[in-house]
């Protein structure tokens, strides 16, 4: 709706990300939008989804609670991956998964961001140098009210002096979640090769593992001993 944003992303942010991923081997991509029935995330669609990429801004409260619960159980109980981008930190699903407010400092001044790789052996950092820079972006700063990440891949620095945990991995149930900070809508960040490469890497990392689901994922079970008890 904003002409400035439409000029940067004529097919929407979701369209820009989808276009890139469709160009990469091994990806079959579809998009979902808030205004679609069930926010575009019906049981049928989610059951056919290995990894869900989530970007949202200003309309988090308009996402159906039923859809959020559906996504939550698909992640924790069935292993679907989730990638949360930028202002998606305030999405219902990310806060449901973290159990925290996910609040932070912010400033919109078009300043530079330098993202340092702090886990160089992590698959999400594959193909990325020691750091990369985004010339103009919105600042996010600590304290970021999230649980301590299970793995931290990137830390951002901003000229105003702030730092931010900008690439955070979490495990919930049998699902994998990656939060990635870059992505303010008024800048062409989702055309940046490094940003797109990280999203691609994260999607491959977050994809479900092909193995039987643990019996205890859906609830506690009473079991017989594997060995003879004396």
Regions found by a protein language model. Give the residues of each.
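Short, solvent-exposed loop/turn segments at secondary-structure junctions
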Residues: 1-2, 37, 59, 89-91, ...
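Aromatic-Pro/Gly-enriched surface loop or interdomain linker
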Residues: 1-49, 217-230
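Short alpha-beta junction capping motif
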Residues: 2, 44-92, 174
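Charged helix-capping and loop-helix junction motifs
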Residues: 13, 66-69, 193-195
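Catalytic beta-strand/loop cores that center a nucleophilic Ser/Cys/Thr
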Residues: 19-22, 28-30, 47, 103-181, ...
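Short, flexible loop segments at the rims of nucleotide/cofactor-binding pockets, characterized by
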Residues: 29-34, 57-62, 156-157
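Oxidoreductase and adenylate-handling cofactor-binding alpha/beta cores
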Residues: 97-102, 132-149, 194-211
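Extracellular ligand-binding/catalytic regions of CAZymes and related secreted enzymes
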Residues: 164, 172-230
């Amino acid at each position: 709706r904003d002409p400035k944003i439409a000029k940067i992303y004529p097919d929407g942010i979701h369209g820009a990300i989808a276009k890139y991923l469709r160009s990469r081997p091994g990806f079959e991509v579809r998009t979902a939008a808030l205004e679609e029935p069930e926010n575009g995330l019906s049981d049928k669609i989610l059951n056919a989804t290995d990894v869900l990429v989530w970007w949202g801004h200003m309309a988090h409260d308009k996402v159906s609670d039923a859809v959020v619960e559906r996504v939550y159980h698909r992640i924790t109980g069935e292993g679907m991956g989730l990638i949360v981008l930028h202002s998606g930190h305030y999405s219902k699903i990310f806060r449901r998964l973290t159990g925290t407010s996910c609040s932070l400092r912010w400033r919109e001044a078009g300043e530079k961001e330098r993202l340092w790789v702090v886990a160089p052996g992590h698959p999400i950092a594959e193909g990325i140098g020691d750091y990369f820079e985004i010339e103009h972006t919105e600042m996010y700063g600590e304290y970021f009210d999230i649980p301590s990440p299970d793995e931290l891949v990137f830390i951002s620095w901003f000229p105003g002096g702030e730092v931010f945990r900008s690439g955070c991995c979490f495990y919930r149930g049998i699902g994998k979640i990656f939060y990635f900070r870059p992505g303010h809508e008024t800048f062409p960040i989702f055309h940046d090769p490094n940003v797109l490469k990280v999203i691609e890497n994260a999607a491959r990392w977050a994809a479900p593992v092909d193995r039987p689901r643990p019996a205890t994922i859906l609830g506690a079970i009473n079991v017989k001993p594997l060995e003879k008890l004396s």
